[in-house]
Regions:
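Terminal leader/tail segments of proteins
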Residues: 1-124
Length: 124
């Protein structure tokens, strides 16, 4: 895990524990918490993830930017916070959501439409 990813993850933990803040971690990364368990991760000026402690859900979105940095941040968030170890891969300029079937352990891919929701891992 890269340093910025671990900083983002630490701020998410604080936000899910209902601490309110608006923290700029680098010139392009920002984490905002509303103090009620909802945390937003922002890359440049685009929201790429929303984690909600009340619904136990993580929603990831690319905001229309399919860049290496966006994919890297989303994959880091998914590996740390989403159940089932989903990830984003790219083949021939198309992004795919890769999920592991819990029964067969087969990896299944479907095209990423710019927004996807997953249940949160147990984080408390």
């Amino acid at each position: 895990m890269r340093v910025i990813d671990s900083k983002i993850s630490a701020m998410i933990t604080k936000g899910l524990n209902k601490e309110k803040f608006d923290r700029k971690l680098s010139k392009r990364d920002r984490v905002v918490s509303d103090g009620h368990g909802k945390v937003r991760v922002i890359l440049w000026k685009t929201e790429i993830a929303v984690l909600d402690a009340q619904t136990d859900e993580i929603i990831v979105k690319n905001g229309g930017f399919e860049s290496v940095t966006t994919k890297s941040r989303i994959n880091s968030l998914l590996s740390e916070w989403a159940q089932g170890n989903p990830g984003i891969s790219q083949r021939k300029w198309v992004w795919y959501i890769d999920e592991v079937c819990p029964l067969t352990r087969d990896r299944k891919s479907k095209e990423f439409q710019g927004l996807a929701a997953f249940p949160l891992k147990v984080w408390r």
